[in-house]
Amino acid sequence: MKKSHLFFVFTLLFIFIGMNLTVLAQNEPVMYFCEKYGRNGEEGVSDRFTTGYITVMVKCDYALNLDNVSIQYDKYNFRTGEFEYYKNFSFTIQPDMKYVYFARNDESDMEFEDPGFYRVFLLDDRDKTVTSSLIEIIP
């Protein structure tokens, strides 16, 4: 009887911890990438692309409360083992947005010219990281 009671308690504890981690993991903005955003939504979602233009997607459960933001690319330098600044693009969004895409426009080409590994950031107007993700660009 004691073994089954102990098993039941540990099972409930495991379920509670697992649910809590799942809820916490979904509370932050998530960044991901696609080839383009069109009428039917995201096209070609991946974390690996050939050189060229991409679209950066950010999705959140709550309003981002941002207006002037930037997307920054840092490229991994295999010689030093560190990421180094590569490019930065400025955008203006509405503070109530929960789902936003950043694509090529007249001021921001959003292009990856060189193959490699990149860390991509969404930065607020004080250059604080809102969210980030890694992407691989292949030839």
Predicted regions and their residues:
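Bacterial N-terminal signal peptides that target proteins for export
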Residues: 1-10
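Generic cytosolic/nucleocytoplasmic N-terminal low-complexity/intrinsically disordered segments
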Residues: 1-2, 19, 74
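Bacterial N-terminal signal peptides
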Residues: 9-18
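Sec/Tat signal peptide C-region and signal peptidase I cleavage site
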Residues: 19-25
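Contiguous segments within soluble domain cores/interaction surfaces
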Residues: 26-115, 119-125, 129-132
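Interdomain boundary/hinge segments at the C-termini of tandem beta-sandwich modules
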Residues: 137-139
